[in-house]
Amino acid sequence: MNIKEQIINLPKVELHCHLDGSLRPETVLDLCLKENINIPYENPEDFKSSLKISKNCSSLKEYLEKFYFPIRVMQKKENIYRVTMELLEDSKKDGIEYTEIRFAPFQHTEQDLNENDVVEAALEALQDGESKLGIHSNLILCSLRHDPVERSIDLVNLANSYNEGVCAVDLAGNESDFPPELHKEAFDLAYDNGIKITIHAGETGIAENILKSIKLLHADRIGHGIFAYKSEEILQYVIENQVPLEMCPKSNVDTKAVKNYKNHPFKKYFDLGVKVTLNTDNRTVSNVSLVDEYLNLANIFDFGIEEIKTVIRNGISASFATEEFKVNLLKKLD
């Protein structure tokens, strides 16, 4: 077997995958037509291409503009179910056995749905993914930095109302203008209720947001964390406390957080003993699969199959799955 076949066959997990950044382009087009959403392209292929990032993308802000149409079409239960199920199908093709899919429910209440309708539509797909595809999954509910803390508190209460299927809460969005502490009250509430927490931090050059997210917002994991190296103190803290980093190299190259793949700190962190995990972030926007990301580790950073297995082990142990599930998946990997 060649390296790609070996990677496909390994039982993998994904911890950082945004639903609205991972819709199939043909599905977005189909739903736009069904919902009479005006698209600014005469050629359907041009529209589908526009959902993916170009090499000329200059920033995270420009990258996030790609979410406009996916969010527009995710305003009905049947559409949310469909795109969630399709993501599970795409994940299964990648050899993923467990995935945590994240999205911001309040972004999908522009029409007739309330936030519970939104979550339940996605959960129905997760249940069918388990029974029909054999892929285990959970939801992570995202709060958005630019929203007031009261909205984040509502989000935490929403997550707390589900005993199964919702495994954690997250804080995402513009970290340059909205530091973690603005949402401390909400994440204190999550922590007090035993809800797992992951926070986007250190994605856009602000290393101190990593430590703030851990100490003020009780983060169990950090989304991205690429700029930990800017502070020796923060990097050592992450290593000594084995704080898992949900790393998404292709996405970071696309947003110009790093110059190119070789400049990404993934290998440096791996060699230093950071608990790095590998993820796609946004499959469609970044035009990447998890197998692609592991192939990049092999081809660009010379990772062998044992090093790849170590990264997968990191992901399994850092996941918010049950301990029993994690033990069984680790046995399967070994």
Curated annotation (Swiss-Prot):
Its EC number is 3.5.4.4. The lineage of its organism: Bacteria, Bacillati, Bacillota, Clostridia, Eubacteriales. One of its GO terms (cellular component) is cytosol. Belongs to the metallo-dependent hydrolases superfamily. Adenosine and AMP deaminases family. Adenosine deaminase subfamily. The keyword NADP does not apply. Pfam families: A_deaminase (PF00962). It catalyses: adenosine + H2O + H(+) = inosine + NH4(+); 2'-deoxyadenosine + H2O + H(+) = 2'-deoxyinosine + NH4(+). The active site is at residue 203. The record marks 224 as: Important for catalytic activity. Keywords: Hydrolase, Metal-binding, Nucleotide metabolism, Zinc. Binds 1 zinc ion per subunit. GO terms for molecular function: 2'-deoxyadenosine deaminase activity; adenosine deaminase activity; zinc ion binding. Its cofactor is Zn(2+). GO terms for biological process: adenosine catabolic process; hypoxanthine salvage; inosine biosynthetic process; nucleotide metabolic process; purine ribonucleoside monophosphate biosynthetic process. Catalyzes the hydrolytic deamination of adenosine and 2-deoxyadenosine. The keyword Lipid metabolism does not apply. This is Adenosine deaminase. Zn(2+) binds at residues 16, 18, 200, 281. It is an enzyme of class 3 (hydrolase). Substrate binds at residues 18, 20, 173. PANTHER family: ADENOSINE DEAMINASE. It comes from the Bacteria.
